A protein has these predicted regions:
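Glycosyltransferase catalytic domains, chiefly GT-A lineage
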Residues: 1-155
């Protein structure tokens, strides 16, 4: 069983994005899966979506993604996270072939050669990451060091 996750925090996206993501995964994943949404919203999600409530925390925007790396956040197994604005058009079974003991992220190839040692050649832009977190792949309980490090040093 694989774990599919998303985060629905705040009001940038409404709950229809969560339900739409669930439908795209259902259509394009042949593996058995559980779909989890880490949420602080009271939207009426699809009945097959398991809600993990965001308890009172000080995390904002994308920082809530880090909570997924807590110990026992979801049952054991592979975890695949998608941002709510991701569009899935084809089968995604093969993504799990990239599963390792580390976190797997998408290379931000679209940043191209404008990246030079973390600085963009374009004025007033800064690129300090060569990866994108709109899709993340990891084994549950194998990347707890990410959450633990963040808890020790949130800045």
């Amino acid at each position: 069983m694989v774990n599919i996750l998303c985060v629905h925090w705040g009001n940038k996206y409404n709950g229809t994005y969560v339900n739409r993501l669930y439908r795209m995964v259902s259509k394009n994943l042949n593996l058995p899966f559980n779909f989890y949404c880490y949420s602080n919203n009271n939207f009426e999600y699809n009945k097959n979506i398991k809600i993990i409530p965001i308890t009172s925390n000080d995390l904002e925007i994308y920082w809530n993604k880090l909570a997924m790396f807590q110990k026992d956040f979801v049952p054991p197994g592979p975890c695949l996270f998608f941002d709510l604005d991701v569009v899935i058009q084809k089968n995604i079974d093969h993504i799990f072939n990239y599963l390792s003991s580390n976190l797997t992220m998408i290379k931000a190839h679209w940043k191209g050669d404008i990246i030079t040692y973390g600085e963009s050649r374009k004025r007033k832009e800064r690129w300090d990451m060569y990866v994108n977190s709109s899709m993340l792949l990891w084994q549950s309980n194998k990347c707890t060091n990410i959450w633990e490090h963040f808890q020790k040093d949130p800045d």
